[in-house]
From Swiss-Prot:
Protein name in the entry: Triosephosphate isomerase
Originating species: Caenorhabditis elegans
CDD domains: TIM (cd00311)
Keywords: Cytoplasm, Gluconeogenesis, Glycolysis, Isomerase, Lyase
Main localization of the protein described in the UniProt heading: cytoplasm
HAMAP family in UniProt: TIM_B (MF_00147_B)
Subcellular location: Cytoplasm
One Pfam family cited in the UniProt record for this chain: TIM
Encoding gene per record: tpi-1
Molecular function GO labels: methylglyoxal synthase activity; triose-phosphate isomerase activity
Classification of source organism: Eukaryota, Metazoa, Ecdysozoa, Nematoda, Chromadorea
């Protein structure tokens, strides 16, 4: 099965109106590439503004959401609100949510289930820390994080898995093409065993972790790497080269 290439841009807590305008300008000026799903995730205050300015071929995602539609949850946003803005995607389980904000596998799984039930597609992030990799626990950590949503019986057609080795996020260190492909292959084998061969074949598994215009082409050639989740590089014009890494 041919899986459509997916490139996400996670702006994290960066930007203002002027910088959003700058990013919109270079994205709107880029040649349309219908062979790639392009989704960018601005900070919550700029979601509606970015959506109003971006061309039709670039979708907008939220960076996070909570597990219920509304209520006394100060500072949170819900999938219902994301949908009300006309958006289709949310990023969940990012390592910064797990490690800076203490989100557990169980909470992330609940949030994922609720987002999917509300009609929002999910970029579901997993990944190991450096000490976990060095201790030989890469497979265990990633499988544990995935098992949390497998146990919930989620529907997989609206999930993209983002493998982001924590030791490579924002550090300038990148997993080699071989290291990334190895883990992506393990993830696909896990889906085949725990869910179904059809889901394993159809689910897009994208790589994140210091992806740049320089390394994207090599990573994009690997058979189980179906795209990228890009951090800092998505704020710069070179992001267009990453979008077109397979072209």
């Amino acid at each position: 099965m041919t899986r459509k290439f997916f490139v996400g841009g996670n702006w994290k807590m960066n930007g203002d109106y002027a910088s959003v305008d700058g990013i919109v300008t270079f994205l709107n000026a880029s040649a349309d590439n219908s062979s790639v799903d392009v989704v960018v995730a601005p900070p919550a205050p700029y979601l509606a503004y970015a959506k109003s300015k971006l061309k039709a071929g670039v979708l907008v995602a939220a960076q996070n959401c909570y597990k219920v539609p509304k209520g006394a949850f100060t500072g949170e946003i819900s999938p219902a609100m994301i949908k009300d803005l006309g958006l289709e995607w949310v990023i969940l389980g990012h390592s910064e949510r797990r490690h800076v904000f203490g989100e557990s596998d169980a909470l992330i799984a609940e949030k994922t289930v609720h987002a999917l039930e509300a009609g929002i597609k999910v970029v579901f992030c997993i990944g190991e820390k450096l000490e976990e990799r060095e201790a030989g626990h890469t497979k265990d950590v990633n499988f544990r994080q995935l098992q949390a949503i497998v146990d919930k019986g989620v529907s997989w057609e609206n999930i993209v898995i983002a493998y982001e080795p924590v030791w490579a996020i924002g550090t300038g260190k990148t997993a080699s093409g071989e290291q990334a492909q190895e883990v992506h292959e393990w993830i696909r084998a896990f889906l085949k065993e725990k869910v179904s061969p059809a889901v394993a074949d159809a689910t897009r598994i994208i790589y994140g972790g210091s992806v740049t215009a320089d390394n994207a082409a090599e990573l994009g050639k690997k058979p189980d790497i179906d795209g990228f989740l890009v951090g800092g590089a998505s704020l710069k014009p070179d992001f267009v080269k990453i979008i077109n890494a397979r072209s």
